[in-house]
Regions:
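Intrinsically disordered/low-complexity terminal segments and short unstructured peptides
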Residues: 11, 22-23, 122
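Histidine-/acidic-rich catalytic cores in large beta-rich domains
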Residues: 28-75, 89, 93-97, 105-611
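C-terminal segment of classical bacterial N-terminal signal peptides
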Residues: 17-25
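Bacterial N-terminal signal peptides
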Residues: 10-18
Length: 611
């Protein structure tokens, strides 16, 4: 009885408080006033609204209908870059308010927003055009690091050649990876063996403006968990679609998020595949191309293995498999001429100071007792191909691949037939030998080439290359323009007398697919020598909006792997943009104090992200 009286008394008091404050309560649960305070004329400011992007915020709509939104963020200091963008009405609805992107870290940002605020009431109620300025503090960059041999969270960008006016508002996504950390690479595949599950580095993804200031970064530990095989691995292959969202992969997953950090999807690979790395791309058909490997492959000797970086899968928007390219059945997985010439100290991100300068013999490559997995060797189940880019050619429904460990760029049709091979002719056999392109000069005359070397010309093949991309805007029938980052290790299918003779190049080729010829029309990097040399990773990509060539030598300074591991040298990647067809820099930026390994850079379009 006493408990009942207490309950009635509490209920009565609660009702009295509700009436006094003007609050009403909905049946089935409590409902009261909002507990946050609006700081402007709509709602509160919510920082990092999706947990993934700490330098973003949403100015909540406060219950109002908001349309006609534009946002600008004031530059920091005299050399800072102002950011300004419009937000479509549907994006305002997606985010429940005004999305704010590009805040400076550890800084009170001045953010001006302009919008139409619709008064409560039926459709057609009056609207008010409002402009107001918010002061929004964003916290410092905070990411997991290695702790030792590290002086900054992320590399510092130093502007060497200021951006030309046409490039002033450019934004560059940087994708780097850590050295192997103690909690990484602790598991391998088994039953069957092989694959590259242990390829597991902490990932660093951030965006800089043309003054080198950080304007966005990803809190990668929200997505990564090294203790979970389906949430570990390297974040790689970032691609921005026409809708402004980012597509990328991470070992056993591929995912799509918008620039605010909102998840579109985050999926495990289809069961026939494993070990995504390097490249993801959306086709004009709305499908996705992913560089993966086979989770169960039957070799000619009857053994079942997991393969390594030698399969391309195409999936639709719902994650259904559309097609696949199994390169061990299309190319020659036993071609070893380039494998024997590669410096084993730097095979993509597998950096081994003890193996620096060493090569492998044919006997080692073909050792029947050798294991399977992420090791240099011939045949399915070993790293014979190492495909690091996949580029769709809508002109004939084909794919163009950079097959690093073969020092070859290869075009393959939907029918799985090889159309052409851009590579030194050495080691190609049978029908594949007939697909190797013939080098010609600018006038179409055949060059004097013997094996892997061409005389009296600047023409060269590309060696352990990255990012073989068609330049759609320049190509026409009979002239397919192709850009390649020629890393330069194993140049001429050999190691030079001195490591310091090595160099890298950004190259543009023009291919006549009917005549089966190739000519070199532009290069940069040879003149920069060993200091600009990147034995692994890197990118060159044509930029249509500014008619320029973006080049990122992502691990410049890694030429001496032993000195790097001993802490005697530091990586200093270089980011450039050149006026098309020239070596005139429109922008040059050097990254210093780097304790990370550069992979790629990607120009980001802010307008499409909020359209």
């Amino acid at each position: 009885m006493r408990l009942r009286k207490i309950a009635v008394a509490l209920m009565t008091a609660g009702l009295a408080l509700g009436v006094a404050s003007g609050t009403t309560y909905a049946a089935g649960g409590g409902s009261g006033p909002k507990s946050y305070n609006a700081v402007g004329k709509i709602g509160a400011v919510r920082m990092n609204p999706y947990d993934l992007a700490p330098l973003t915020a949403i100015i909540m709509n406060g219950g109002y209908k908001i349309t006609g939104v534009s946002v600008s963020i004031a530059p920091k200091g005299p050399n800072g870059v102002a950011l300004a963008y419009k937000v479509s009405d549907r994006k305002v609805l997606n985010h429940g308010g005004i999305p704010v992107w590009g805040l400076y870290p550890d800084h009170v940002n001045k953010v001006e927003v302009t919008y139409d605020r619709h008064q409560p009431g039926p459709t057609g109620s009056p609207t008010e055009r409002i402009t107001e300025t918010y002061s929004i503090y964003a916290p410092p960059v905070s990411l997991l690091g290695q702790g030792v041999n590290q002086s900054t969270v992320l590399p510092k960008a130093v502007v060497v050649t200021p951006a030309a006016p046409a490039l002033r508002n450019n934004l560059y996504l940087m994708n780097h990876l850590s050295p192997v950390l103690p909690n990484a690479a602790q598991v391998v595949w088994n039953n069957p063996a092989g694959g590259a599950l242990e390829w597991d580095y902490e990932s660093y993804v951030w965006i800089v403006d043309t003054s080198g200031d950080i304007r966005w970064y990803m809190k990668t530990d929200v997505l990564r968990d090294p203790a979970n095989i389906y949430r570990k691995g390297n974040m790689m292959g970032f691609f921005q679609g026409k809708d402004g969202t980012l597509l990328w992969g991470m070992s056993q997953r591929y995912m799509k998020y918008d620039l605010m950090g909102r998840e579109i999807f985050n999926r495990v690979l289809p069961r026939s595949y494993q070990d995504f790395s390097h490249h993801a791309e959306e086709t004009p058909n709305g499908t996705f191309l992913l560089r993966v490997a086979s989770s169960d492959f039957k070799r000619r000797d009857g053994k079942n293995v997991r393969t390594v970086r030698d399969v391309i899968v195409e999936v639709d928007r719902d994650g259904n498999v559309v097609d696949e390219w199994r390169l061990a059945e299309i190319l020659d997985p036993y071609r070893d001429v380039n494998l024997k010439a590669m410096d084993q100290g730097a095979v993509c991100l597998n950096i081994d100071a003890d193996a620096a300068g060493k090569t492998m013999s044919q006997e080692q490559l073909e050792d029947p007792n050798a294991g399977f997995g992420d090791i240099t060797g011939v045949g399915p189940g070993r790293n014979w191909a190492h495909v690091n880019s996949v580029n769709y050619d809508a002109a004939d429904d084909s794919i163009i691949l950079s097959v690093r460990n073969q020092s070859a760029t290869v075009k393959i049709g939907r029918d799985k037939q090889v159309k052409w091979i851009l590579s030194s002719p050495e080691g190609w056999k049978g029908d594949l030998a007939k697909k190797v392109l013939t080098p010609v000069d600018l006038k179409g005359g055949k060059l004097d080439c013997q094996g892997s070397k061409c005389n009296n010309t600047d023409f060269d093949w590309s060696w352990v290359q990255h990012t073989s991309y068609k330049v759609n805007e320049k190509s026409r029938p009979g002239a397919l323009h192709l850009t390649v980052f020629d890393n330069g290790d194993s140049r001429g299918n050999e190691q030079p007398a001195l490591p310091t003779q090595k160099y890298s190049r950004a190259v543009e080729y023009v291919i006549d697919e009917k005549a089966m010829t190739v000519k070199q029309v532009w290069e940069f990097g040879k003149e920069r020598g060993f200091g600009w040399y990147s034995p692994i990773t890197s990118v060159v990509e044509y930029q249509a909006r500014t008619d320029s060539m973006m080049v990122y030598s992502a691990v410049a300074g890694m030429g001496d792997v032993k000195a790097l591991r001993a802490g005697k040298v530091k990586l200093e990647p270089w980011l450039h943009e050149f006026k098309y067809g020239t070596k005139t820099p429109l922008l040059e930026m050097k990254f210093t104090e780097s304790s990370t390994i550069g992979y790629r850079s990607l120009k980001v379009d802010l307008e499409s992200a909020f359209r």
